[in-house]
């Protein structure tokens, strides 16, 4: 049941956080974001970090891949959390529309990928959820 809440919480958590290394990401990441960053840069970084999470989750099918995915998720969650702290954790409705308005389709797509992967892992490999959840639970709302 806790994992069901995790999936729901993840969708709700999509109101901002982000950072991490650029090792596997093209464009902005959470480490690039400051309080002075443009809405466009914030949106790009957020979607890039969430894409990193989605990509990692899609690889999970055994204990080794779950551990590898958890390391990638850790980097993305660190980035999301750093971005949230840099932006004081609050984005007004207007600012949120500026950030995600033009990228709404991308945002919905990456959220769907994450939710689908979490459901698949929970259904097919419930024993791997603790490994994944340990990192996902660190995401600040």
Where are the regions a protein language model picked out?
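Immediate post-signal-peptide N-terminus of mature secreted/exported proteins
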Residues: 23-74, 138-141
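Compact alpha-helical subdomains of small soluble proteins
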Residues: 76-141
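Classic N-terminal secretory signal peptides
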Residues: 7-13
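Bacterial N-terminal signal peptides that target proteins for export
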Residues: 1-7
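C-terminal motif of bacterial Sec signal peptides marking the signal peptidase cleavage site
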Residues: 15-18
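Intrinsic-disorder-associated interaction segments
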Residues: 5, 32-39, 66-69, 73-76, ...
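Alpha-helical interaction segments
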Residues: 9, 35-36, 94
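Intrinsically disordered, low-complexity peptide-like regions
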Residues: 1, 21-22
């Amino acid at each position: 049941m806790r994992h069901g809440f995790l999936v729901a919480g993840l969708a709700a958590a999509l109101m901002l956080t982000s950072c991490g290394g650029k090792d596997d990401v093209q464009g902005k990441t959470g480490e690039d974001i400051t309080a002075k960053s443009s809405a466009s840069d914030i949106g790009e970084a957020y979607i890039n970090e969430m894409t990193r999470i989605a990509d990692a989750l899609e690889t999970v099918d055994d204990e080794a891949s779950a551990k590898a995915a958890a390391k990638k998720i850790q980097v993305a969650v660190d980035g999301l959390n750093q971005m949230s702290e840099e932006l004081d954790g609050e984005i007004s409705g207007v600012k949120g529309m500026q950030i995600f308005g033009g990228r709404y389709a991308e945002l919905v797509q990456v959220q769907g990928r994450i939710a689908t992967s979490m459901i698949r892992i929970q259904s097919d490999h419930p024993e791997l959820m603790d490994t994944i959840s340990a990192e996902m639970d660190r995401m600040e709302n």
